[in-house]
């Protein structure tokens, strides 16, 4: 296909669909990690397009930390059913037994045990040799230098100095037993591209992305939504009802909201055109230490 005849978004769409089909052709047991966010929603939409009118020939998998927003879980179950795809939900039961949580153990331990170790458990349990993820290069520095086909060793570790060249959109999927590839079909998309494509394709997303009055408390400059009664309030702390939305979604105690009036897709896109801050500024886990995302990825984080 001549790219000169395609719009910018259609070029990105064609590239992503090509990557998804390549993985299915190359690997024996792929899986699509479904984190329920806007990028996962776009990736799922592209996968369904890639194999329409059939169903994508791989399952969805959600690594559930047990601390996701309630609206995210409801949306996850609905979308998996609508897509007609198998949904694997994996929870690190060892972490649950130890009572690991963001309040009791802090974001660093919680993320390592309930996300990184849980993901590695699931990949080993089901013996997946390729895993799709919705990460984009414009999100964060360590992701900016990651390949579309990101090689992981037998311990699921990522070595940024040992990456394979990807010339002329040719991807090397050769792995030995126990090794795997993390695949990022949205690598070349930007946050604005994602929102424009959601608008163009009318892709359903979690309502938390739209501005609404929600109960929040401000901690260390971050607006945290009080999503259930597990969140301990500090002395004298009272949740305020504020017009907020989320640019990125994760565990609710570790995800900051932004004050916003953008309640429709056109309003969100307009807001994106004017903003100068990173979408991950609201992710508490990114504030653990300098380079913390790269360190997490070296240990097996997505």
From Swiss-Prot:
Its EC number is 2.7.7.4. It holds the Pfam family PAPS_reduct. One of its GO terms (biological process) is hydrogen sulfide biosynthetic process. Pathway: Sulfur metabolism; hydrogen sulfide biosynthesis; sulfite from sulfate: step 1/3. It catalyses: sulfate + ATP + H(+) = adenosine 5'-phosphosulfate + diphosphate. InterPro entries: PAPS_reduct_dom, Rossmann-like_a/b/a_fold, SO4_adenylTrfase_ssu, Sulfate_adenylyltrnsfr_sub2. Gene3D superfamilies: HUPs. Keywords: ATP-binding, Nucleotide-binding, Nucleotidyltransferase, Transferase. One of its GO terms (molecular function) is sulfate adenylyltransferase (ATP) activity. The keyword Transport does not apply. Heterodimer composed of CysD, the smaller subunit, and CysN. With CysN forms the ATP sulfurylase (ATPS) that catalyzes the adenylation of sulfate producing adenosine 5'-phosphosulfate (APS) and diphosphate, the first enzymatic step in sulfur assimilation pathway. APS synthesis involves the formation of a high-energy phosphoric-sulfuric acid anhydride bond driven by GTP hydrolysis by CysN coupled to ATP hydrolysis by CysD. HAMAP family: Sulf_adenylyltr_sub2 (MF_00064). Belongs to the PAPS reductase family. CysD subfamily. PANTHER family: SULFATE ADENYLYLTRANSFERASE SUBUNIT 2. This is Sulfate adenylyltransferase subunit 2 2. It comes from Alkalilimnicola ehrlichii (strain ATCC BAA-1101 / DSM 17681 / MLHE-1). The lineage of its organism: Bacteria, Pseudomonadati, Pseudomonadota, Gammaproteobacteria, Chromatiales. The gene is cysD2.
């Amino acid at each position: 296909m001549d790219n000169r005849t395609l719009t910018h978004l259609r070029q990105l769409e064609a590239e992503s669909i090509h990557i998804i089909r390549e993985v299915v052709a190359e690997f024996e047991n792929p899986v699509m990690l479904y984190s329920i966010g806007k990028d996962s929603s776009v990736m799922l939409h592209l996968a369904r397009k890639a194999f329409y009118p059939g169903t994508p020939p791989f399952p969805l998998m959600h690594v559930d930390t047990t601390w996701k927003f309630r609206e995210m879980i409801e949306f996850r179950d609905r979308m998996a059913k609508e897509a007609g795809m198998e949904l694997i939900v994996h929870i690190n039961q060892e972490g649950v037994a130890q009572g690991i949580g963001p309040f009791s153990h802090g974001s660093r331990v919680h993320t390592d045990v309930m996300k990184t170790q849980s993901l590695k458990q699931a990949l080993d349990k089901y013996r997946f040799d390729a895993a799709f993820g919705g990460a984009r290069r414009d999100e964060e520095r360590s992701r900016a230098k990651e390949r579309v086909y990101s090689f992981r060793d037998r311990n699921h570790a990522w070595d940024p100095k040992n990456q394979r060249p990807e010339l002329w959109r040719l991807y090397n999927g050769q792995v030995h037993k126990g090794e795997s590839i993390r695949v990022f079909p949205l690598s070349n998309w930007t946050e604005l591209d994602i929102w424009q494509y959601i608008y163009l394709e009318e892709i359903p997303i979690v309502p938390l992305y739209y501005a609404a009055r929600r109960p929040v408390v401000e901690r260390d400059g971050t607006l945290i939504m009080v999503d259930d009664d597990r969140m301990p309030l500090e002395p004298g702390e009272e949740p305020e009802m504020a017009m907020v939305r989320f640019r990125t979604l994760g565990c609710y105690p570790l995800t900051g909201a932004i004050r916003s009036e953008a309640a429709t897709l056109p309003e969100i896109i307009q807001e994106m055109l004017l903003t100068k801050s990173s979408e991950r500024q609201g992710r508490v886990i990114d504030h653990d230490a300098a380079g913390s995302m790269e360190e997490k990825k070296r240990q097996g984080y997505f």
